[in-house]
UniProtKB/Swiss-Prot annotation:
Keywords: Signal. It comes from the Archaea. Pfam families: DUF7289. InterPro entries: DUF7289. This is Uncharacterized protein AF_0758. Residues 1-29 form the signal peptide.
Length: 305
C-alpha cells in the first residue's frame, strides 16, 4: 500500500515538473512570438511613416499639390494633434527692452515679441522677469501625426519621425527633418541653413485593423530669407526652439550632430540652462558666423479622410 502511494506521489511530482516546464516554455514562446509580431509590425509602420514623411514633403515643397495615402493600422490609432509642438526661430537682442524697436524687417515675416529663453514662451511685451528678451520671431504651432499601439508611439513632427515607448524617457529619431546646412556650386563660398517645416492641419482620427486611406493637400506657405550680414549689430543671437515636443532628447541629439551650424551648449545667464539636454525645451543657438543665408519655409499641409 505504501509503495503504491509512493509511486503515485512520484508520478504527481514528475507530472508537476513537466507541467511547470511546459508553462515556462509556453510563456517564453508566447513572449518570443509577441516580440516577433511587434518587431514585424514596427518595421512595417516605420516604413509607412517614412512614406508619409516623403509625401508630406512632396505635397508641401514639391510639385504634387494633392496625394492620397494608405496605411495598415494593425490595431493601433492614428491621429492629428494640432495643439503642439511650437517651432520657433528667434533672433534675439539682449539689451533692447521694447521688441517693437527691433528692425524686424531684416527678418521677413517675423513678429516682434518678447521671448523667455528658459521656457520658450512668447509675450507681446517684456513685462515679465527673468530670461526675457526682445526678439524678432518666426513661430508656428506645427502639429504632429501620432500612431499609438499599446505603449508604443510613432510621431511625425516638423518633418521628422520619432519612435518612443511610454515607459521610456527618451525617443529614437528614425528619419531626420529637412533642416539642411550646405554650400552650393552656384554660390561659391556661401553657406546656407535651410529649414523646411510642414504645418500639419485639417482633421485625422482613425483606428482599428485593416487599411485606411486619407488625403494630403497643399496649403498656404510662408517663406523667410534672412541675410546674416544684414542683421548687423541689432541681434546678439539666433535660436531654434521646439516648445512642447515630447521628443526633446532626440531633437537635442540631432542638433548636436549638426554641430557646424547649431550649438547645444547654452549660456545659463540667458537661458537658465547650460545644455540642450537639460533644458525645458529642445533648443540650440545658430552659429551665425558659419552661415551666410538662413531660409525658413513654413508650408501648410491639410489632412482629410
Amino acid at each position: 500500500m505504501s509503495k503504491a502511494v509512493s509511486e503515485i506521489l512520484g508520478y504527481m511530482y514528475i507530472f508537476g515538473i513537466v507541467m511547470a516546464v511546459l508553462a515556462i516554455v509556453f510563456v517564453q514562446v508566447n513572449t518570443m512570438t509577441e516580440d516577433m509580431k511587434r518587431s514585424v509590425m514596427s518595421q512595417s509602420l516605420e516604413q509607412s511613416f517614412k512614406k508619409i514623411q516623403y509625401i508630406i514633403h512632396s505635397v508641401s515643397f514639391g510639385e504634387v499639390p494633392s496625394q492620397a495615402v494608405e496605411i495598415e493600422l494593425q490595431g493601433g490609432t492614428l491621429t492629428l494633434d494640432k495643439s503642439d509642438p511650437e517651432f520657433i526661430v528667434a533672433f534675439v537682442n539682449y539689451t533692447e527692452t521694447n521688441p517693437s524697436n527691433l528692425p524686424c524687417g531684416r527678418v521677413p515675416n517675423s513678429v516682434p515679441l518678447c521671448i523667455n529663453l528658459s521656457t520658450g514662451r512668447l509675450y507681446t511685451a517684456c513685462t515679465h522677469t527673468g530670461y526675457n528678451f526682445s526678439a524678432c520671431t518666426l513661430n508656428h504651432t506645427i502639429g504632429k501625426i501620432v500612431y499609438r499601439y499599446k505603449d508604443w508611439f510613432l510621431t511625425l513632427e516638423a518633418g521628422s519621425v520619432f519612435s518612443k515607448y511610454s515607459n521610456q524617457d527618451y525617443s529614437k529619431l528614425l528619419y531626420e527633418p529637412r533642416i539642411l546646412y550646405n554650400a552650393t556650386l552656384s554660390t561659391p563660398g556661401k553657406r546656407f541653413l535651410v529649414m523646411t517645416i510642414p504645418l500639419l492641419d485639417g482633421e485625422l482620427s482613425i483606428g482599428g485593423s485593416g487599411r485606411f486611406r486619407f488625403v494630403l493637400n497643399e496649403g498656404n506657405s510662408n517663406v523667410s530669407l534672412i541675410s546674416v550680414s544684414n542683421l548687423g549689430q541689432d541681434f546678439n543671437d539666433a535660436y531654434v526652439i521646439l516648445r512642447g515636443t515630447e521628443n526633446k532628447d532626440a531633437w537635442c541629439r540631432f542638433f548636436e550632430r549638426s554641430g557646424d551650424v547649431f550649438n547645444t551648449t547654452l549660456d545659463d545667464t540667458k537661458t537658465s540652462y547650460r545644455r540642450c539636454s537639460n533644458s525645458e525645451n529642445a533648443m540650440a543657438s545658430i552659429k551665425l558666423s558659419n552661415v551666410h543665408e538662413i531660409i525658413v519655409i513654413f508650408r501648410q499641409v491639410l489632412f482629410s479622410t
